[in-house]
């Protein structure tokens, strides 16, 4: 009797379920509207006077003795300027100095300003004012800068000229030429051969 009662109850339950209207289908969630990224802003037009210097763009490094190295980074020309930085790292990790360089296209010339600071970021008392150089010539992946005509504004000391050039696609060469002291032969130029950091 208990089994029959249980079967009767189950059948009644089944019949009532079968007779009940089917539940309404669950609405399918609509996909969110596609979101498009905003268009990248147009880059400022680069001053044509800086285009011959674009070869300097990138990160460059040279290994030196005793585990030391030098690094130089140049942002691409944008608008009327480009920016560069330089540091020398000793084998023990210390950085004795940094240099920060700005190249700017002015109305009738291209200038290079450079600040030199100690490793603790304090300015060198002998170089509080930036050095001022002027682009002498540029082309063919080579550029030469010379001190401004007014020595008081140039703050270039015994510097004669600075030249950057590419030696192949992945080697940036920096040549620093000192002035010859009166009555003495010119000192040998300093040359830094820096490989592109990839």
List where the protein language model places each region:
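Edge beta-strand at a domain terminus
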Residues: 126-138, 171-198
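Central antiparallel beta-sheet cores of small beta-barrel/beta-sandwich binding domains
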Residues: 47, 62-151, 155, 160
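Compositionally biased, proline/threonine/alanine/serine-rich low-complexity intrinsically disordered stretches
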Residues: 17-46
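Bacterial N-terminal signal peptides
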Residues: 4-16
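N-terminal helix-cap/turn-to-beta initiation motif at the start of protein domains
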Residues: 45-59
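Extended Gly/Ser/Thr-rich low-complexity repeat segments
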Residues: 157-170
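Short, structured patches in soluble enzyme cores that scaffold and shape functional sites
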Residues: 147-149, 166, 176-178
């Amino acid at each position: 009797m208990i089994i029959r009662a249980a079967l009767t109850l189950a059948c009644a339950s089944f019949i009532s379920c079968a007779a009940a209207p089917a539940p309404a289908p669950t609405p399918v969630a609509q996909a969110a509207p596609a979101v498009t990224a905003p268009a990248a802003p147009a880059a400022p037009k680069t001053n044509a006077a800086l285009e011959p210097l674009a070869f300097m763009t990138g990160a460059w490094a040279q290994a030196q003795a005793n585990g030391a190295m030098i690094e130089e980074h140049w942002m691409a020309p944008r608008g009327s300027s480009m920016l560069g930085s330089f540091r020398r790292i000793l084998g023990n990790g210390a950085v004795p100095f940094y240099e920060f360089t700005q190249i700017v296209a002015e109305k009738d010339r291209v200038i290079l300003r450079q600040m030199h600071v100690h490793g603790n970021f304090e300015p060198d008392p002998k170089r509080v004012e930036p050095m001022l150089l002027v682009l002498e010539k540029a082309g063919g992946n080579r550029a030469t800068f010379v001190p401004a005509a007014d020595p008081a504004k140039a703050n270039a000391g015994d510097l004669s000229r600075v030249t950057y050039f590419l030696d192949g696609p992945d080697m940036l060469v920096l040549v620093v030429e000192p002035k010859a002291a009166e009555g003495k032969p010119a000192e040998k130029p300093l040359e830094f051969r820096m490989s592109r950091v990839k």
